């Protein structure tokens, strides 16, 4: 969303500056804080030393890092427990697997000094963990503590995956590479792209960069992240949805009551049938009375 980008990186009004500061306040970012604490604990736990070796990867050691992170960036008890449960589940399922860790939290460029792909497109970010498997495959991991799951189709078409794979292909041109969303609440969703797909993505990304570079004013785009956007109170699109009573349609379904979801689904289906009938009626009227 170019509007959110403008609000965040180039706030102009007092309201924009205030909302940006509010988003960073502890009471507004408990879920984000526990996510960061979980990420940091995994990063330090897996971090190799100068010789490329890691310490003993035990659960107790992982929890020591988690507790240390919470002493630096504290969260309420319920969020602390949520992070603890995620790490426990993650360790039982994936933490015991032997794997060579190349690096953790490896950066490529910054907002002010981005990494430039071979076609000149600037990108920046951090790769949570880089692993090397026995067959030589390089795996790029991105930890996710979000409540929404990620489908295989979403991973196969992820812009984040594309950027990371494009960078990794330039770092390891002869290696097999894959990207994985490591969803701490669910499991791992991996995607492998051919060199042709990576090259095509880089070409597309360059067109997006050139388009964004020409934008003089942000344009709001409605999407899944709107419910958590700090600037919804200023966003004209969000305000329009609120006034029409459609804002709640952006709510995710994860964790909702099953009966409520079934009731909502029945309502949606009934409404869809009525709208379909209305559409057919209008189409017939226009065909018989206007276009004949």
Where are these regions (language model features)?
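Short amphipathic alpha-helical face segments that pack within enzyme cores
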Residues: 37-40, 159-167
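A non-catalytic, helix-rich entry segment at domain boundaries
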Residues: 26-28, 33, 37-114
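Hydrophobic/aromatic-lined pockets within catalytic cores
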Residues: 11, 43-50, 91-92, 131, ...
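Metal-dependent nuclease catalytic regions and adjoining charged, substrate-binding loops involved
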Residues: 70, 119, 151-156, 165-270, ...
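Non-catalytic protein-protein interaction segments used by genome-maintenance enzymes to assemble
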Residues: 103-161
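Short acidic (Asp/Glu) and glycine-rich catalytic loops that position anionic groups and cofactors
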Residues: 9-21, 40, 141-145, 180-189, ...
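C-terminal, charged and often intrinsically disordered regions of DNA end-processing helicases
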Residues: 1-31
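Short, hydrophobic/amphipathic alpha-helical patches that form generic packing surfaces
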Residues: 3-9, 36-47, 262-269
